[in-house]
Amino acid sequence: MWDPDVYLAFSGHRNRPFYELVSRVGLERARRVVDLGCGPGHLTRYLARRWPGAVIEALDSSPEMVAAAAERGIDATTGDLRDWKPKPDTDVVVSNAALHWVPEHSDLLVRWVDELAPGSWIAVQIPGNFETPSHAAVRALARREPYAKLMRDIPFRVGAVVQSPAYYAELLMDTGCKVDVWETTYLHQLTGEHPVLDWITGSALVPVRERLSDESWQQFRQELIPLLNDAYPPRADGSTIFPFRRLFMVAEVGGARRSGG
């Protein structure tokens, strides 16, 4: 179960990639803007400001996130983004930190391009940090008893979930899109007693929490702390540097043909 409040604890750090992603969409006016994986809706509101007058459509798989979005005035729907189909007036599709949960997201991107009208835009940001020490520590601990039996079928994400920037660039170029693809590793300066644990509690540890009792969950967290502290030791000033790689792709549907590319 996703907890909007836990997820938003690091909103200042998590919001920046969204703004950098959307800033590269080169469309001044839009009829319909879609936020796939809208979360608690705090960033969806920015889309309404960026494209005033547009219909804002939002979707998330978590009922808790959709409820939080509704509290912010967002008319969000609970659903699976794999089932989403664009309406004819869709001009912009944004998916920020969601597609890594969908193993077949490459096929999904190609399908969206095929279903959207020329001149539409797709903007996607995907975390690409699944081989980092934080994820490796979670997987290693989950393989130990008493957790292994409870979590043996969790599809923990690994590096292969997210491909290289060149892969996505070629994938979208082959569909006739004009593309802008890049990656960035953010060096987040976190504070708090166990900041990396707190960060991943709002994201990577969500499927773990769903499998464990309250007592087992607290035990898992306590056993994870020394693993994370070894990988991300606090600095003398009390802060912790947390590197986080993210991949961005912005595509104008049919743009390559119109620009002669």
Curated annotation (Swiss-Prot):
InterPro entries membership: Methyltransf_25 (IPR041698), SAM-dependent_MTases_sf (IPR029063), Trans-aconitate_MeTrfase (IPR023506), Trans_acon_MeTrfase_C (IPR023149)
GO MF annotation list: trans-aconitate 2-methyltransferase activity
Compartments, record wording: Cytoplasm
UniProt keyword annotations, A-Z: Cytoplasm, Methyltransferase, S-adenosyl-L-methionine, Transferase
Domain of life: Bacteria
GO annotation, cellular component aspect: cytoplasm
EC number(s) from the headed UniProt entry: 2.1.1.144
Enzyme class: transferase
Pfam families: Methyltransf_25
Keyword Disulfide bond: no
Predominant location category: cytoplasm
Catalytic activity: trans-aconitate + S-adenosyl-L-methionine = (E)-3-(methoxycarbonyl)pent-2-enedioate + S-adenosyl-L-homocysteine
Family, per entry: Belongs to the methyltransferase superfamily. Tam family.
PANTHER family for this protein: TRANS-ACONITATE 2-METHYLTRANSFERASE, TRANS-ACONITATE 2-METHYLTRANSFERASE-RELATED
Purpose of the protein: Catalyzes the S-adenosylmethionine monomethyl esterification of trans-aconitate.
Name of the protein: Probable trans-aconitate 2-methyltransferase
Native species: Mycobacterium tuberculosis (strain ATCC 25618 / H37Rv)
Taxonomy of the source species: Bacteria, Bacillati, Actinomycetota, Actinomycetes, Mycobacteriales
